[in-house]
C-alpha cells in the first residue's frame, strides 16, 4: 500500500458546465438558499478527500455473531468513539465497537484494533408484531436521539410486493435489552430503504426535508429497485414521530427503474457502458457540506470485459448469477451528482430518472490490492460532525484467521479546495489523494 491513493475518473458526457450555465445555476440557488451559502459553494471532487487512516475490526464471536463475512452496514457516532456494525450476513445481528484513533500505518499488522463494546444481538426476531414479510437483510443504520433507526429488505422478494422497510432499536446504548419497534413503511419502499444521511443544515430549505434516504439494485429482483443510486427527501419528524404500521412520506429527487435506468446496456455488451452495470452497487449517498454535490460511493464491474449470467469466468469460477467475464473486472467506484438537478426535480422541472452524475469512476483504496481480485467496499458512512467518510473494505484483513477474513475500516476527511474555488466549473479528472 502506498502513501497515496489514485483515483481514476470518468467525467460524464453531459454538456452542462461553463460559466454561463454555472451562473444560471447560482442564480437559481439565490431564490432557495441564503446568500452566504451561495458564496461558499463548489463542486466536490474526489481530490477533496484526504486519507485519515485505517483500523482493524476483531473477528472473534461476540454474542450472536462475528465480523467474518460481515454484511456491511455500519453507523459511526458523531464523536467517532464507537460504531454500530452489522455482523455475519447469515446472522443479521448488530453490535457496537469502540474505535481507536485511525492510523496511517502501511501494514495491516500495525493498524490498531477496535474493541467490542456491546455484543452482537439479533433484531428481526425481537419485533413485537413479528416479521410477516420476511425482511431478512439490514441495509442501513442511523443513530437519532438515542435510537438506532434500521432499514431492511427481503433479499429475494420475488413478488416485489414488500412494504415493510424500517424499525427502531429504542435504546442504542442497551442493544441486548432495548425494546424494538417496527415495522414502518417508507413510501418509496425498497427504492429508498438503504442509506440514511443528514442534509446539511443550511440546505434544509432546499427540499423541505432533513434527511436523504437512498438505495440501488444491490440485491435480486430488479423490478422492485432503482436501477442506479437513488435519493429521496425524508422529514425528521415523520421518522421519529412514526408508529409501527405508519407510512413515512418520501420525496423523489433521484430515482430510476427498469424502464428508465441510469444506464442502458446493463450487461455492457457494447463495451461502452462505464457508468452502471448489473455488477454496480451503491452503499452511501450524501450531500457534501459546503458544496453542490450529492456523492455516492459503492462498487462496479464489467466495464472492461462485460457481464454475463451464470457464466464461467476466466479463472474458472462458475457464477450463481450475474458477474463479469473477467473475474478481476470489479472495482470500488463513485458517482457525483449536481444537487441543482435534484432541486429541479423537487420543483417539477425535471424527472427523477433524467438526473445524471457529472463525474464517476474507479476509486483505488489502501489495502484493496492484495493479489487476485481487489477487496471491495461492503458498507460506507458519512459523519457530518467531522466531515469524514468511512469505508468498510470487505475481507481485507486476512491476518486474524486462516479460515475467514475480517473487514478494515478506512477513513477520509473531506477538505474542500479553496473554500469555493471551482464553483465556476466542474472538477477535472482527479489524479490522486495525498496521505496527510
Predicted features, each with a name:
Residues 41-66, 353-371:
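A short helix->beta-strand "capping" segment at the edge of beta-propeller domains
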Residues 53-89:
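Beta-strand-rich domains and repeat architectures in extracellular enzymes and scaffolds
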Residues 66-80, 126-149, 154-158, 187-212, ...:
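Structural signature of eukaryotic scaffold interfaces centered on beta-propeller domains
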Residues 89-90, 154-156, 216-219, 300-302, ...:
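Residue-level signature of beta-propeller blades and closely related beta-rich strand-turn architectures
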Residues 95-140:
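Blade-loop segments of beta-propeller domains
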Residues 96-110, 160-183, 224-246, 313-343, ...:
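Beta-propeller blade signature
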Residues 272-370, 380:
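Loop/turn-rich, solvent-exposed surfaces of beta-rich toroidal or solenoidal domains
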Residues 376-420:
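Blade-level signature of beta-propeller repeat domains, shared across WD40, Kelch, NHL, RCC1
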Amino acid at each position: 500500500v502506498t502513501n497515496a491513493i489514485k483515483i481514476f475518473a470518468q467525467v460524464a458526457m453531459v454538456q452542462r458546465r461553463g460559466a454561463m450555465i454555472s451562473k444560471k445555476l447560482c442564480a437559481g440557488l439565490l431564490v432557495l438558499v441564503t446568500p452566504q451559502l451561495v458564496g461558499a459553494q463548489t463542486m466536490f471532487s474526489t481530490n477533496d478527500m484526504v486519507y485519515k487512516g485505517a483500523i482493524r475490526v476483531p473477528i472473534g464471536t461476540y454474542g450472536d455473531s462475528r465480523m467474518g463475512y460481515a454484511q456491511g452496514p455500519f453507523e459511526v457516532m458523531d464523536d467517532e468513539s464507537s460504531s454500530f456494525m452489522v455482523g455475519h450476513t447469515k446472522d443479521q445481528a448488530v453490535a457496537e465497537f469502540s474505535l481507536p484513533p485511525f492510523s496511517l500505518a502501511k501494514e495491516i499488522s500495525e493498524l490498531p484494533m477496535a474493541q467490542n463494546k456491546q455484543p452482537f444481538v439479533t433484531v428481526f426476531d425481537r419485533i413485537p408484531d413479528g416479521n410477516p414479510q420476511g425482511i431478512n437483510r439490514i441495509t442501513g443504520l442511523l443513530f437519532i436521539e438515542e435510537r438506532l433507526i434500521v432499514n431492511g429488505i427481503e433479499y429475494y422478494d420475488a413478488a416485489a410486493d414488500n412494504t415493510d422497510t424500517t424499525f427502531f432499536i429504542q435504546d442504542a446504548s442497551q442493544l441486548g435489552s432495548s425494546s424494538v419497534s417496527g415495522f414502518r413503511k417508507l413510501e418509496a419502499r425498497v427504492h429508498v430503504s438503504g442509506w440514511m444521511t443528514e442534509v446539511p443544515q443550511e440546505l434544509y430549505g432546499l427540499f423541505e426535508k432533513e434527511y436523504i434516504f437512498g438505495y440501488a439494485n444491490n440485491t435480486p429482483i430488479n423490478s422492485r429497485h432503482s436501477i442506479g443510486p437513488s435519493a429521496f427527501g425524508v422529514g425528521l419528524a415523520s421518522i421519529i414521530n412514526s408508529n409501527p404500521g405508519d407510512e413515512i412520506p418520501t420525496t423523489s429527487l433521484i430515482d430510476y427503474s427498469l424502464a428508465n435506468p441510469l444506464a442502458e446496456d446493463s450487461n455492457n455488451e457494447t463495451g461502452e457502458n462505464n457508468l452502471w452495470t448489473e455488477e454496480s452497487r451503491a452503499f452511501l449517498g450524501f450531500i457534501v457540506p459546503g458544496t453542490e454535490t450529492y456523492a455516492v460511493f459503492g462498487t462496479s464491474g464489467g466495464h472492461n470485459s462485460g457481464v454475463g449470467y451464470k457464466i464461467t469466468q476466466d479463472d474458472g469460477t462458475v457464477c450463481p448469477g450475474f458477474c463479469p467475464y473477467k473475474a478481476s473486472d470489479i472495482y470500488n467506484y463513485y458517482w457525483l451528482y449536481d444537487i441543482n438537478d435534484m432541486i429541479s426535480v423537487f420543483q417539477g422541472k425535471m424527472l427523477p430518472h433524467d438526473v445524471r452524475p457529472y463525474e464517476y469512476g474507479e476509486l483505488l483504496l489502501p489495502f484493496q490490492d492484495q493479489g487476485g481480485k481487489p477487496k471491495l467496499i461492503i458498507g460506507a458512512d458519512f459523519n457530518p460532525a467531522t466531515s469524514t467518510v468511512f469505508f468498510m473494505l470487505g475481507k481485507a484483513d486476512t491476518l486474524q484467521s486462516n479460515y475467514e477474513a475480517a473487514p478494515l475500516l478506512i477513513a477520509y476527511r473531506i477538505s474542500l479546495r479553496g473554500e469555493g474555488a471551482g464553483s465556476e466549473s466542474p472538477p477535472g479528472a482527479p489524479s490522486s489523494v495525498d496521505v496527510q
